[in-house]
Amino acid sequence: MNEQTTTNTAAHDEPLAVLPPVDDDAAGREAVREKMADALTPGFQVEFDPDEAERVGAFVEDALSEQDAAASGDDLVEVDGALEPAFLDDEGPSADIPPFITTTNARELYDLRPGETVAQAAARKASEG
């Protein structure tokens, strides 16, 4: 039979070292900060638990009220009916589809000046000849 001896050392007689209290709030903020930094990495998928998602504002209700939504549609009624898409060519804006479609912009085609509309630039170009 084996004989075992135990010795008491001074380390065993001392109480455990007192650990500082854990600040759960600070630890949670740090975890969320790290996850938000990871979320900015392209292709990296980060999972948030509901408490973390709430901390970063995932459940904040910021949608328009019904009254505000209805009021925001009123500005669409004020749009002039004359504003429609048009094809631009050397002869000016036209609703007819051109036989050859190329990409350009009004600045190049009409030498559009700052603050000038396409219609004004087309009229200016026509008057210049």
From Swiss-Prot:
This is Protein TraD. InterPro entries: Conjugal_tfr_TraD_b/g-type. The gene is traD. Residues 1-25 are annotated as: Disordered. It comes from Escherichia coli. To plasmid IncP-alpha RP4 TraD. Keywords: Plasmid. It comes from the Bacteria. Residues 1-10 have a biased composition (Polar residues).
